[in-house]
């Protein structure tokens, strides 16, 4: 057994202040009054076996006495090692008693007494005393081996003045009673609702039409939660005029409707707009007249007669009779014809009035022939389709824009006119044989002449400044 002693006052410091890391060293022991004496929060004792493994054992005792003379500590330990148990280290701590006066930050004196006993703790060689597991205190966790560590400590801490001040404020606020701010009202609001306590007004005066606050006649606004002058309120209103106007403006604000392009409402809107401006081919007001097939004249420069289809929402231009100069032939009645598409050909355009005109620009011949019975039923015998197998003679187109008998142009499709009002009569024009008189046209009520030969059609040149839309309108 070997014994040795050491003086802690001459060695490296052991006690540290965790908030002010100023150690107790030899310099601090000389002038203990120059620095405050903090309370030691904890002491960490670490022992490492740096000696020879052949040492049978050892004990050491240490004692320290501070300059203030009020603290004593004693520590005894014995080192035992044997070859049977292996290289192990055993600590035996005796009871440590210390009495001292410690000063806190604010100068208030406190006295701490610690007494504790702990059983022997065996630490195997090679395992660290302090572990690296985060969030756990692993000083002797892995080496206790199921032993119960019992420690008893009693400490009386000193509370800081800041905490005391906060507690005093909370207690004052809880004990302080609030009253209504209306003059003459002494209603205690401690048991009232939080809303009334916050705004310092009782429930009766919050709904009163007129109260006196600070010598002025006021009224409590329900939305502003404060008192306003009586001039800011309307009669029998609990809120001021400004708040009510803002509230009503938000409620009456028109909301913009989002138009869905796939909705039936939008389709109906476009359908109504098209019905007013567009022309429907293939049906009459009575549902009897139907347009027949359309033929083309390949020998006349590639004419192709198709039905006019107006694009949606496209503005149309209507030209009166007084704005244009027309040729000699005029078709009486409201006539709707097919549109002839050929390069710069403007088409057949009826205009406003009772005598719409058929215009042709840039093309000498016109191939529009209208055929129908007097009762409005289509004449299928006289209307030929594109798949017609009838043979026709060679084309002979003269400069006078007339098609002679034996020409190549067959009778073309039927164009039915639809009018805006169902009471107006429907006038259907028919092309006549060259032998018939009367300008080559006949009206409803007359029997249609037989179309044994090719129909005669006369085209008119456009004056040059006409409309270029090529669509028909009825007014």
UniProtKB/Swiss-Prot annotation:
Residues 51-73 have a biased composition (Low complexity). A zinc finger (SBP-type) spans 177-254. Its main location: nucleus. Induction: Negatively regulated by microRNAs miR156b and miR156h. InterPro entries: SBP-like, SBP_dom, SBP_sf. Expressed in young panicles. It is found in: Nucleus. GO terms for cellular component: nucleus. Zn(2+) 2 binds at residues 221, 224, 228, 240. Pfam families: SBP. Zn(2+) 1 binds at residues 180, 185, 202, 205. Keywords: DNA-binding, Metal-binding, Nucleus, Transcription, Transcription regulation, Zinc, Zinc-finger. PROSITE patterns: ZF_SBP (PS51141). The SBP-type zinc finger is required for the binding to DNA. Trans-acting factor that binds specifically to the consensus nucleotide sequence 5'-TNCGTACAA-3'. May be involved in panicle development. This is Squamosa promoter-binding-like protein 12. The lineage of its organism: Eukaryota, Viridiplantae, Streptophyta, Embryophyta, Tracheophyta. The gene is SPL12.
């Amino acid at each position: 057994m070997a014994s040795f002693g050491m003086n802690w006052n001459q060695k490296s410091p052991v006690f540290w202040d965790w908030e002010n890391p100023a150690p107790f060293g030899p310099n601090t022991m000389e002038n203990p009054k120059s620095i405050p004496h903090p309370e030691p929060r904890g002491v960490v004792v670490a022992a490492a076996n740096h000696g020879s493994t052949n040492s049978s054992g050892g004990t050491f005792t240490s004692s320290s006495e501070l300059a203030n003379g009020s603290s004593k500590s004693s520590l005894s330990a014995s080192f035992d090692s044997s070859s049977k148990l292996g290289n192990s280290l055993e600590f035996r701590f005796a009871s440590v008693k210390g009495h001292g006066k410690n000063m806190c930050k604010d100068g208030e004196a406190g006295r701490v007494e610690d007494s504790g006993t702990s059983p022997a703790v065996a630490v195997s060689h090679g395992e660290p005393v302090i572990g690296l597991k985060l969030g756990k205190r692993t000083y002797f966790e892995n080496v206790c081996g199921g032993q119960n560590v019992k420690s008893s400590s009693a400490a009386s801490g000193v509370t800081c003045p800041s905490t005391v001040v906060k507690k005093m404020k909370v207690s004052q606020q809880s004990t302080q009673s609030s009253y209504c701010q209306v003059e003459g009202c002494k209603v205690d609001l401690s048991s009232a609702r939080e809303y009334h306590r916050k705004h310092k007004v009782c429930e009766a005066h919050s709904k009163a039409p007129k109260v006196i606050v600070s010598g002025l006649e006021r009224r409590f606004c329900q939305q502003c939660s404060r008192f306003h002058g009586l001039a800011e309120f309307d009669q029998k209103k609990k809120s001021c005029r400004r708040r009510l106007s803002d509230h009503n403006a938000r409620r009456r604000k028109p909301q913009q409707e989002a138009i869905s392009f796939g909705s039936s409402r939008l389709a109906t809107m476009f359908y109504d707009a098209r019905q007013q401006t567009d022309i429907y081919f293939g049906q009459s007001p009575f549902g009897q007249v139907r347009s027949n097939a359309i033929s083309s004249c390949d020998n006349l420069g590639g004419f192709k007669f198709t039905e006019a289809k107006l694009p949606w929402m496209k503005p149309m231009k209507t030209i009166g009779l007084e704005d244009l100069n027309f040729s000699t032939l005029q078709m009486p009645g409201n006539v709707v014809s097919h549109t002839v598409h050929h390069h710069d050909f403007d088409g057949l355009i009826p205009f406003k009035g009772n005598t719409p005109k058929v215009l042709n620009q840039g093309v000498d011949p016109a191939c529009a022939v209208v055929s129908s019975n007097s009762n409005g039923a289509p004449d299928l015998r006289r209307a030929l389709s594109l798949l017609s197998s009838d043979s026709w003679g060679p084309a002979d187109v003269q400069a006078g824009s007339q098609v002679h008998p034996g020409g190549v142009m067959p009778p073309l499709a039927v164009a039915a006119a639809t009018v805006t009002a169902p009471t107006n009569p429907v006038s259907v024009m028919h092309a006549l044989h060259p032998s018939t008189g009367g300008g080559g046209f006949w009206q409803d009520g007359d029997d249609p002449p037989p179309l044994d030969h090719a129909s005669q059609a006369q085209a008119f040149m456009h004056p040059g400044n006409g409309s270029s839309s090529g669509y028909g309108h009825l007014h």
